[in-house]
């Protein structure tokens, strides 16, 4: 599905977006939340809303890499978890609630294709802290569903502040936000 509006990160520095379309990043972010969702964003309520409305970096292969805004500077720049490349094409995302099993089903399918049955094995899982904050109690529901559908003997892992993974076997590793990354952990 095409994004509602595409923007350019016209000035960046690591994980800091200085300007979007040649304007202060925070000003643009405020306007997007106001016009698209009716949210009056301020520096005081920034993080309470930002966790639910991350930026998406649009890639040439139609993938979207999530970047959660975490801080605003006095100069109007916005810090995100993860690097924002210069001139990246951005869009504003609305983080979904539990996605009716799509994420878990996709993980189960990928693991099965790579390793066969996961029954009685250990699944190493890295769960994004931002995803946990956004979903609230839904995060536990998602993990219980993952454990049940993979039929693993043990679900182990950590809450993480960014996940490294790829979207295809032997693909280039990328830093992700709001992700659930899993792998078979041999005994």
Regions found by a protein language model. Give the residues of each.
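Small-residue-enriched flexible segments
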Residues: 1-136, 140-153, 158-187
């Amino acid at each position: 599905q095409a994004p509602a509006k595409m923007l350019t990160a016209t000035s960046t520095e690591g994980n800091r977006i200085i300007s979007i379309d040649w304007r202060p990043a925070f000003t643009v972010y405020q306007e997007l939340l106001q016009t698209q969702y009716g949210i009056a964003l301020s520096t005081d309520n920034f993080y309470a809303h930002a966790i639910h409305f991350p930026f998406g970096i649009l890639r040439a292969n139609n993938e979207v890499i999530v970047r959660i805004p975490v801080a605003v500077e006095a100069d109007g720049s916005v810090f995100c978890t993860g690097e924002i490349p210069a001139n990246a094409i951005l869009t504003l995302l609305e983080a979904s609630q539990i996605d009716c099993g799509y994420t878990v089903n996709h993980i189960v399918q990928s693991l099965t294709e790579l390793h066969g049955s996961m029954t009685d094995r250990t699944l190493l899982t890295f769960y994004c802290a931002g995803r946990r904050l956004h979903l609230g109690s839904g995060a536990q529901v998602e993990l219980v569903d993952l454990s049940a559908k993979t039929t693993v003997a043990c679900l182990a892992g950590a809450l993480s502040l960014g996940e490294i993974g790829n979207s295809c076997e032997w693909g280039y590793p990328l830093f992700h936000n709001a992700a659930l990354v899993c792998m078979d952990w041999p005994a």
